From Swiss-Prot:
This is Inner membrane protein YnjI. The chain crosses the membrane at residues 39-59, 69-89, 235-255. Keywords: Cell inner membrane, Cell membrane, Membrane, Transmembrane, Transmembrane helix. The gene is ynjI. Signal peptide: none annotated. It holds the Pfam family DUF1266. It comes from Escherichia coli (strain K12). It is a multi-pass membrane protein. GO terms for cellular component: plasma membrane. Residues 1-38, 90-234 are periplasmic. Residues 60-68, 256-346 are cytoplasmic.
Amino acid sequence: MKKVLLQNHPGSEKYSFNGWEIFNSNFERMIKENKAMLLCKWGFYLTCVVAVMFVFAAITSNGLNERGLITAGCSFLYLLIMMGLIVRAGFKAKKEQLHYYQAKGIEPLSIEKLQALQLIAPYRFYHKQWSETLEFWPRKPEPGKDTFQYHVLPFDSIDIISKRRESLEDQWGIEDSESYCALMEHFLSGDHGANTFKANMEEAPEQVIALLNKFAVFPSDYISDCANHSSGKSSAKLIWAAELSWMISISSTAFQNGTIEEELAWHYIMLASRKAHELFESEEDYQKNSQMGFLYWHICCYRRKLTDAELEACYRYDKQFWEHYSKKCRWPIRNVPWGASSVKYS
């Protein structure tokens, strides 16, 4: 039987299409676009409360007059209609998501590609994004290509896409596919940070250990092990988890913004994934190295020297994704098996 792709409603942690939650999340989205919608939201809640009060009065009172009974009846009908709209929102969200996949030709991913996206699943889960497709948020169909009327499924706004493109350009120098490829090769060469960690651990390991443990608790033997080249591996672990996570996240974002094509994004994502599953024994092993790597990079490689308070904030920021994911996530991506460590990176 063919697998049907179905993910969370964007903006929700739940995989079930909870009509009330979707109804509320759409209200929040509309309020961001138009502050006046806040009055509509609270007006809706207020009318529901008043309707409940009228219905309660009708049930508990022994002698409502005719006008009171009519008011209570209308209030009850109003509540039924509102409940119907809320339930409908859940069904409509599911229908729209399925239609979106069909219209765009999006199919369930192979296990290998799911294993690749699992590497950044904690970040996507924290931000309530999609986890089983390359695009992490629905992208508005091009004019004329999909005439279906979407009412519940939230799309990336032009403003958000513009800000992400600006961020990729400012932080990573990505303007087109050529500059994207140059950055990916820079990561794979180790020159972004992995080689610096290796050199520093060879020259002054005690200093590196002291710097890292100023903001977090990484056992000294663990940090030393990351610098040692194990037999049968293409390299030492170094801070490769952080580097590879950046590669996958940047590739996904560049595709989401329309900067690069899907095929190119998957090419580098799968290169990163194969290296990750060759070097690390489990998801926990990968995420631990990732946290250490992000912290090290911000201490020793970032173009601007950060204060201790900023470094501590960076570490807490990166750590929260895995903590939240490991405690709360019930998404299918959580159950994807770790890739075979025997698969060599090439």
